Amino acid sequence: MRILGSKARLVFSLPGNYKASSPSFLSELIGTLFAAVFPTDCLLCGRELTGPGGASICHACWESMQPWLGLSCERCGLPFASSQASDAIDSLCGSCRLDEPEFDVARSYGLYTGNLRKAILQLKFHGREFLANRLGEFLAQAFKALSEPDSAIVAPVPLHASRRRQRGFNQAELLARGLVRWLRRKERFEGLQFVADLLRRTRATLPQVGLSVSARRQNVSGVFSVARPERVRNRTIVLVDDVMTTGATLSACAAALKRAGASRVLALSLARASPQFPDSGTG
């Protein structure tokens, strides 16, 4: 058996002495399929799983994904290192003082580091779409910190159609669905509205990873549009993405929403990559 691609397509090669109808082959086939769908080792640390059937990440790894509780920029949510906090003016980072983002406020659950980063990579590049439900719970914690009304519209940062076809899904959409599902079920946010196609990306762009701050802004400038402006007029919009680095993509989305008449745009991400914390990498 070979597992091909992030969608885990299974290709079986039968040995010459095996018959597909033999009990031994069927037993091995079932076992192989079960191991592929329900791994026996944690996806992140490799330790043997001892939880209920179908678990994929061990309890210790989930527990290690803690929220950021330190000081951060009041506008964009950039985490401050202890030496940096005293230099902040009016609780704003240098970037927000020089060039205010288009969104009203941005918050992230945690730093893009450690097991949170690994879980996002498993979701994004290895087809572990089922992780979005649990990660949506983490997003819900960040959402509740915003103290927003439950009548907001939740929308994902869109992928271009070609990128979505290549990947098979939009990870931001999966996370946004997980967030709304959790808030409705556990927090009784019945008025929260999820709209998957609120925004569209009008052209393909280069990946943001590796680009400078100015190049990131230029790369996504004018890329997003609102399909039906009447849906956002005078509404509060919560934008969801997996990782926020400079905020260029979320700011470009917010600009399109504000042009369409949105009264308030909040940016919510699962993790924040920050140069002040080298281990957090880039999104």
Regions found by a protein language model. Give the residues of each.
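Glycine-rich phosphate/pyrophosphate-handling loop used in enzymes and phosphotransfer proteins
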Residues: M1-G283
